[in-house]
Amino acid sequence: MGKISGSGTVAPHILVIFGASGDLAARKLIPSLWDLFEQELLPRTFGILGAGRTALSTESFRARLAEAVTKHAVRTPHDPARLTEFLQKIHYFSFDPTDSVAFADFATYVRTLDQSLHTEGNFIFYLATPPSLYETIPTQLAMHHLNREQGNFRRVVIEKPFGYNLETAQHLNASLRAHFQENQTYRIDHYLGKETVQNILVTRFANPLFEPTWNRTHIDYVEITASESLGVENRGGYYDQSGALRDMIQNHLLLLLGIIAMEAPAVVSSSRLRDEIVKVFDCLRPMGERDVMQHTVRAQYVAGKIRGVAVPGYLEESGVDPRSCTETFAALKCYIDNWRWMDVPFYLRTGKRLPTGVTEVIVHYRTLPIALFEHIERPCAREGNALVIRIQPDEGIQLKIDLKEPGAGFKTIPVSVDFQYSALTYSHLPSAYERLLLDCMNGDNTLYHRDDAVESAWRFIDPILAAWKSNKSPLLTYPAGSWGPKAADDLIKGSAPRWHHPSSTLLSDDFACRL
């Protein structure tokens, strides 16, 4: 089973989770902390303090989390005594974080717990809360002097969405800077914690096979797809205020674009890596209204079938305004105006209720100027070589090339050279939250967003949102279970007949045309 290694000995501390009675803590945070505990990567002197409005005792909170660990952890608990040892590190405090008097009581409790656990005044404050509290909680922490570092550390972790647009992101950054230094602030994007995302850097910069050809001379175009077969589930109210562009492209897909397109840093360090990603964002070609009309597609799913099961349309989902114009599908054609990538199109696509749930990057290489060999036409074959980087699921890399078909003549057939993480000696990759939580504990913010990166991404997205709001690009529809509206295929036709349609398994990806 996969194991991650820390960058050093983690100092004693208390991890405070605001919104601890919510879904994120139960499904991701606590199970990931258990996995770190099982690998003996947590310090012996360590505590978890859950904080939330829900009235719970510490014992009832622990009982909830025991069930969550059993259900969601990568490493299923087999030793009841070991699980009990972990649960004994967990505490709970019920209060309203918007109430200053209640927050004073909470601050007193935190300091008392710190003294009893001997955690040396070190705190990580994780905001697993609605975005409406992203300004309130850090302000309250500062009012009660829980932000000050005096030979110890105080860090704050903030989930996405970080802002609703450029203006709100800048306001939130300014508010945070008033109370926490940038090196105390950790803006989390779980995509950066995925092994396959980090492996893009190694694939590019550790292999002379790829880096010399990673440019406009050899690469024709790049596709980045994050498809979901699920609908909005129980997040209808949140999603209706967000949409696919804000929810996925502004953060996850632009991040993947940044890593694919960045220059090699002089050294692998937090500041250098993040500098290069910001440079990519700053070089994104701005979109005016005409560009938005020509280079973007937005759509909303209507009733259809997913793997033969009927599902409702978006407007029939719980919590969604029946008159909503929120997009559940978004596709962009964008350019990076720098020496390496000038005029190479990057196609970004995301959507809900698509045939399968897959995130992958496909780098398409240019065809040769002269075709010496006869190519066998296959309904799903693509001209040219391609590198498929599968982020999730069935993580791996696939290099698509042409070889000679056995027999007389020189007819070529498309084949693939594959690597899958499942082929390694361990059976499970560490979860993204395992890696990111451990990095934060070690004070390593390499895989967290910096303030200027967030603002640069919003600076690119804002004009698209504005044009969509004024209906410069129509809101289309697509049946659930399809790959989106026809206009999305029209968007990519300048580079290919259609998008690369991912399969649920890497080895049957696209050439086999199986979903």
Curated annotation (Swiss-Prot):
The keyword Metal-binding does not apply. This is Glucose-6-phosphate 1-dehydrogenase. Catalyzes the oxidation of glucose 6-phosphate to 6-phosphogluconolactone. Keywords: Carbohydrate metabolism, Glucose metabolism, NADP, Oxidoreductase. The active site is at H252. Gene3D superfamilies: Dihydrodipicolinate Reductase, domain 2, NAD(P)-binding Rossmann-like Domain. NADP(+) binds at R53, K160. It comes from Treponema pallidum (strain Nichols). It comes from the Bacteria. Disulfide bonds: none annotated. InterPro entries: G6P_DH, G6P_DH_AS, G6P_DH_C, G6P_DH_NAD-bd, NAD(P)-bd_dom_sf. Pathway: Carbohydrate degradation; pentose phosphate pathway; D-ribulose 5-phosphate from D-glucose 6-phosphate (oxidative stage): step 1/3. The keyword NADP applies. GO terms for molecular function: glucose-6-phosphate dehydrogenase activity; NADP binding. It holds the Pfam family G6PD_C. Substrate binds at H190, K194, E228, D247, K352. GO terms for cellular component: cytosol. Belongs to the glucose-6-phosphate dehydrogenase family. Its EC number is 1.1.1.49. It catalyses: D-glucose 6-phosphate + NADP(+) = 6-phospho-D-glucono-1,5-lactone + NADPH + H(+). NCBIfam families: zwf.
